[in-house]
């Protein structure tokens, strides 16, 4: 994730791959996951010719598609991540000049997706969305329960409610698109590290596994 390493690590990734991306005329757009520092996704911190980490509610227009991007999800192991970081943060940060918004970490408290009605209203004025890319998914999509969720919840009293709210945010996003007559036909997401797809009420929902690719026609 963006934030597990120093910023220089991600800059080196760009330098290593820039030539072949230019030759292939390809771009990589990163949508925020729960293991990413949101500070990288404000539009300028990680923005290069062929690589960009985009803010939530970004609209991509490519190949005759208008694509809405909204990141974020809940880490069910967040208590472990917080405790683990507390053990190692002094050693890590003692080797850095100073802490800042993009200092390394294992968990970010603002990881969850957020529903922004104002941004959606603005989008509706200028765009007709046909494709949605998110990290998590609406509540009617798999997975309905992540493995070991209840075990993690034993030591995290707010976890089950936060996970439910995460999916409700996606439901609100979908509802806003529907009532404003957006021609949504595809919805892509990840988060659950499995592969699944289903056509539900005219929308093809596709959960992508790690390193799984899907072509949008």
Protein language model regions, located:
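Core catalytic region of metal-dependent phosphoesterases/phosphodiesterases
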Residues: 1-63, 151-154, 158-159, 163-169, ...
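Catalytic metal-binding/acid-base residues of hydrolase active sites
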Residues: 1-3, 34-37, 73-74, 137-139, ...
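Short glycine-/acidic-enriched loop or helix-start segments at secondary-structure transitions
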Residues: 5-7, 39-42, 79, 141-144, ...
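Generic beta-sheet signal
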Residues: 31-33, 70, 208
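A short, sequence-level motif marking secondary-structure junctions
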Residues: 57-58, 71-76, 211
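Binuclear metal-dependent phosphoesterase catalytic core
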Residues: 61-63, 171-180, 192-217
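Active-site-proximal loop/helix segment associated with metal-binding centers of metalloenzymes
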Residues: 65-168
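Proline-aspartate-enriched helix->loop->beta-strand connector
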Residues: 128-138, 175-189
């Amino acid at each position: 994730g963006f934030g597990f390493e120093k910023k220089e690590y991600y800059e080196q990734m760009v330098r290593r791959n820039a030539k072949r991306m230019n030759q292939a005329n390809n771009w990589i757009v990163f949508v925020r996951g729960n293991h990413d520092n949101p500070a990288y996704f404000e539009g300028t911190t990680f923005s290069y010719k062929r690589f960009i980490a985009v803010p939530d509610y970004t609209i991509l227009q490519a190949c005759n598609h208008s694509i809405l991007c909204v990141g974020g999800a809940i880490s069910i192991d967040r208590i472990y991540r917080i405790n683990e970081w507390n053990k190692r943060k002094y050693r890590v940060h003692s080797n850095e000049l100073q802490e800042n918004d993009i200092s390394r970490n294992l968990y970010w408290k603002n990881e969850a997706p957020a529903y922004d009605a104002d941004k959606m209203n603005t989008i509706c004025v200028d765009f007709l969305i046909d494709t949605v890319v998110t990290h998590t998914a609406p509540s009617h999509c798999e997975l309905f329960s992540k493995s070991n969720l209840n075990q993690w919840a034993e030591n995290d009293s707010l976890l089950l409610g936060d996970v439910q709210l995460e999916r409700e945010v996606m439901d609100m996003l979908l509802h806003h698109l529907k009532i404003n007559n957006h021609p949504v036909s595809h919805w892509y997401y990840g988060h659950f590290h499995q592969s699944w797809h289903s056509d539900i009420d005219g929308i093809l929902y596709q959960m992508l596994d790690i390193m799984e690719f899907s072509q949008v026609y």
